[in-house]
A protein has these predicted regions:
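A basic/glycine-biased coupling hinge at the interface between accessory DNA-binding modules
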Residues: 2-19, 37-38, 59-264
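A cross-family signal for key residues in well-ordered alpha-helices
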Residues: 33-34
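Walker A/P-loop
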Residues: 38-57
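A sequence-level detector for short glycine-anchored, His/Arg-bearing signature motifs
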Residues: 29, 46-47, 120
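Short helix-coil-helix linker/hinge
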Residues: 23-28
């Protein structure tokens, strides 16, 4: 669709208002915050404000959505709306803030549609605390601010039945895993010096880290006897876990990816 003069004027003023909202950031931080189209990678050292950028980016997504990068005016926008925004840009009165944000928003996300993933529990707690201060407790509680494994567990507890598991699944620890593995090795009458339980478990763990299923692993074996047996063990191991309605730690992410790939909804 061809841009009109009204579109260009509206988009320019809207962008300026949104930039004004994040004027406390430096230029590079603000650029990252306002980038909403496609993936974004931020490389920065410790203490450079990465978490601040993440928090402010979430605020932008919640309040303005794609507004900063949208080139078109809303379909129902009027010249009066444009004049209002221009007046607000020049004199941002607090009592006009709500309407200005509404006129600048393009498909803003709802809090429960935002997911912010961290590596550690400490980082997740800090992120949640800062979100409470930034957007309020109610919205912060609705945002998915968790570690990878916590977020994946929440997804699995809700929808793992689509993979043939019950929602009451258990998570096997290292001792549970080893017990299952030893039983499998003995059932196959394999030399435990050649097929050490710990080494086999580590191999399977690496496969899961790389999102390689038992079937995919078996397809890569070719004429390698050792790998062929690992593929067989891997298949039996996953079958044993499923029969027990259990996952191991690596399955938490592996099964979540499988669930999302197989179910777009």
């Amino acid at each position: 669709m061809e841009l009109t003069k009204f579109d260009i004027q509206y988009a320019s003023i809207r962008r300026a208002i949104i930039e004004q909202r994040f004027a406390h950031l430096n230029e590079m931080q603000r650029e990252a915050v306002l980038q909403t189209e496609g993936p974004l990678l931020i490389l920065a050292g410790a203490g450079s404000g990465k978490t601040t950028v993440l928090i402010q980016r979430i605020i932008n997504i919640l309040r303005f959505g794609r507004g900063a990068q949208c080139e078109y005016a809303p379909a129902n926008a009027t010249p009066d709306d444009l004049r209002f925004l221009l007046d607000y840009l020049n004199d941002p009165k607090p009592e006009c803030e709500h309407r200005a944000e509404w006129l600048c928003a393009v498909e803003p996300a709802r809090p429960w549609e935002v997911i912010a993933i961290t590596f550690t529990n400490k980082a997740a707690r800090e992120l949640k605390e800062r979100l409470v201060r930034a957007v309020g407790e109610q919205d912060a509680d609705a945002i998915w601010a968790y570690t990878f494994h916590t977020a994946c567990l929440r997804i699995l507890r809700r929808d793992i039945e689509r993979l043939g598991y019950d929602k009451s699944f258990t998570i096997y620890d290292e001792d549970d895993k080893k017990r299952v593995m030893v039983d499998i090795l003995r059932s196959l009458k394999l030399d435990e010096k050649v097929f050490d339980a710990r080494a086999v478990m580590n191999t399977i763990s690496r496969a899961k880290d790389n999102l390689i299923s038992p079937k995919a692993y078996a397809a890569e074996v070719k004429d390698d006897y050792y790998k062929g047996k690992i593929a067989e063990i891997y298949t039996l191991y996953q079958k044993a876990l499923k029969n027990a309605n259990a996952l191991d730690f690596d399955d938490i992410i592996f099964k979540t990816v499988q669930l999302l790939r197989q179910n777009e909804d």
